Amino acid sequence: TAITRKDIAVEGEIQRIFYNNEYLGLVVRDEAKTGYQLHIYTSEGNENAVTEQDELHTGYAFQQRNIVMYDADYCEVQSFSGRIRFAREFGNTLYTVIPGDKFKTYYLATMEELQQIKLR
Protein backbone atom coordinates (compact mmCIF):
# COMPACT_ATOMS: atom_id res chain seq x y z
CA THR A 1 0.00 0.00 0.00
CA ALA A 2 1.43 3.36 -1.03
CA ILE A 3 1.42 6.18 1.48
CA THR A 4 0.91 9.68 0.12
CA ARG A 5 1.99 12.77 2.01
CA LYS A 6 0.81 16.20 1.01
CA ASP A 7 0.68 19.46 2.93
CA ILE A 8 -2.77 21.07 2.99
CA ALA A 9 -3.14 24.76 3.82
CA VAL A 10 -6.24 25.46 5.90
CA GLU A 11 -7.69 28.89 6.61
CA GLY A 12 -9.44 28.89 9.99
CA GLU A 13 -9.38 26.64 13.02
CA ILE A 14 -9.86 22.90 12.45
CA GLN A 15 -12.74 21.65 14.61
CA ARG A 16 -13.08 18.01 13.50
CA ILE A 17 -11.04 15.50 11.49
CA PHE A 18 -12.46 12.24 10.12
CA TYR A 19 -11.27 9.79 7.48
CA ASN A 20 -11.49 6.39 5.86
CA ASN A 21 -9.33 4.62 3.26
CA GLU A 22 -10.47 6.94 0.45
CA TYR A 23 -11.17 10.37 1.96
CA LEU A 24 -10.12 12.85 4.62
CA GLY A 25 -12.66 15.29 6.04
CA LEU A 26 -11.87 18.54 7.85
CA VAL A 27 -14.49 20.71 9.54
CA VAL A 28 -13.09 24.23 9.80
CA ARG A 29 -14.55 27.25 11.57
CA ASP A 30 -15.24 29.88 8.93
CA GLU A 31 -13.85 33.07 10.47
CA ALA A 32 -15.51 35.32 7.88
CA LYS A 33 -18.97 33.85 8.53
CA THR A 34 -20.79 32.39 11.51
CA GLY A 35 -20.66 28.77 10.35
CA TYR A 36 -18.25 26.06 9.31
CA GLN A 37 -16.80 24.65 6.12
CA LEU A 38 -16.53 20.93 5.53
CA HIS A 39 -13.55 20.14 3.26
CA ILE A 40 -13.23 16.70 1.69
CA TYR A 41 -9.89 15.51 0.30
CA THR A 42 -8.97 12.37 -1.59
CA SER A 43 -6.38 10.01 -0.12
CA GLU A 44 -3.87 11.70 -2.45
CA GLY A 45 -4.55 15.06 -0.77
CA ASN A 46 -6.56 16.66 -3.57
CA GLU A 47 -9.60 18.69 -2.54
CA ASN A 48 -12.75 16.91 -3.69
CA ALA A 49 -15.52 19.13 -2.26
CA VAL A 50 -16.29 21.99 0.13
CA THR A 51 -19.70 22.58 1.70
CA GLU A 52 -20.97 25.24 4.07
CA GLN A 53 -22.28 23.97 7.41
CA ASP A 54 -24.35 25.88 9.98
CA GLU A 55 -23.54 23.63 12.91
CA LEU A 56 -20.66 21.63 14.33
CA HIS A 57 -21.62 18.02 15.08
CA THR A 58 -20.14 15.57 17.58
CA GLY A 59 -19.40 12.77 15.12
CA TYR A 60 -18.63 12.48 11.42
CA ALA A 61 -18.09 9.45 9.16
CA PHE A 62 -17.87 8.63 5.47
CA GLN A 63 -19.91 6.08 3.59
CA GLN A 64 -18.89 6.04 -0.05
CA ARG A 65 -19.76 9.56 -1.29
CA ASN A 66 -21.93 10.47 1.69
CA ILE A 67 -21.08 12.10 5.00
CA VAL A 68 -22.81 11.00 8.20
CA MET A 69 -23.03 13.73 10.86
CA TYR A 70 -24.52 13.13 14.29
CA ASP A 71 -25.02 14.47 17.80
CA ALA A 72 -26.64 13.03 20.93
CA ASP A 73 -30.16 13.34 19.49
CA TYR A 74 -29.71 14.13 15.78
CA CYS A 75 -28.42 12.41 12.65
CA GLU A 76 -27.92 13.78 9.14
CA VAL A 77 -26.62 12.15 5.97
CA GLN A 78 -25.36 14.52 3.29
CA SER A 79 -23.85 14.01 -0.15
CA PHE A 80 -20.44 15.48 -0.97
CA SER A 81 -22.25 18.27 -2.84
CA GLY A 82 -24.19 19.21 0.32
CA ARG A 83 -27.54 17.61 -0.58
CA ILE A 84 -29.30 16.38 2.57
CA ARG A 85 -30.37 12.77 2.07
CA PHE A 86 -31.59 12.14 5.62
CA ALA A 87 -32.12 14.30 8.72
CA ARG A 88 -33.86 13.21 11.91
CA GLU A 89 -34.05 14.10 15.58
CA PHE A 90 -34.31 11.29 18.12
CA GLY A 91 -36.03 11.14 21.49
CA ASN A 92 -33.34 8.79 22.76
CA THR A 93 -29.65 9.47 23.19
CA LEU A 94 -27.87 8.55 19.97
CA TYR A 95 -24.51 6.97 20.81
CA THR A 96 -23.14 6.34 17.36
CA VAL A 97 -24.00 5.97 13.69
CA ILE A 98 -22.42 3.06 11.86
CA PRO A 99 -22.32 3.07 8.05
CA GLY A 100 -23.58 -0.29 6.81
CA ASP A 101 -21.84 -2.57 4.36
CA LYS A 102 -24.36 -1.69 1.64
CA PHE A 103 -24.69 1.74 0.03
CA LYS A 104 -27.26 3.98 1.78
CA THR A 105 -27.62 1.66 4.79
CA TYR A 106 -26.88 2.94 8.31
CA TYR A 107 -27.25 1.65 11.85
CA LEU A 108 -28.21 4.08 14.61
CA ALA A 109 -27.34 2.92 18.13
CA THR A 110 -29.33 4.35 21.05
CA MET A 111 -29.51 3.14 24.63
CA GLU A 112 -32.77 1.30 23.90
CA GLU A 113 -32.26 -0.07 20.40
CA LEU A 114 -30.25 -0.46 17.22
CA GLN A 115 -32.13 0.91 14.20
CA GLN A 116 -31.35 0.14 10.58
CA ILE A 117 -32.01 2.92 8.10
CA LYS A 118 -32.04 2.40 4.34
CA LEU A 119 -32.14 5.53 2.20
CA ARG A 120 -33.82 5.57 -1.20
Residue ranges and their predicted role:
Residues 1-11, 32-53, 72-91, 111-120:
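Surface-exposed loop/turn elements that mediate protein-protein interactions on large endomembrane-trafficking
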Residues 97-118:
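Hydrophobic, glycine-enriched assembly/anchoring segments
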Residues 5-6, 24-26:
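Acidic (E/D-rich), amphipathic helical modules within compact regulatory domains
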Residues 9-22, 52-65, 91-104:
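Repeated scaffold domains used in trafficking and secretory/extracellular systems
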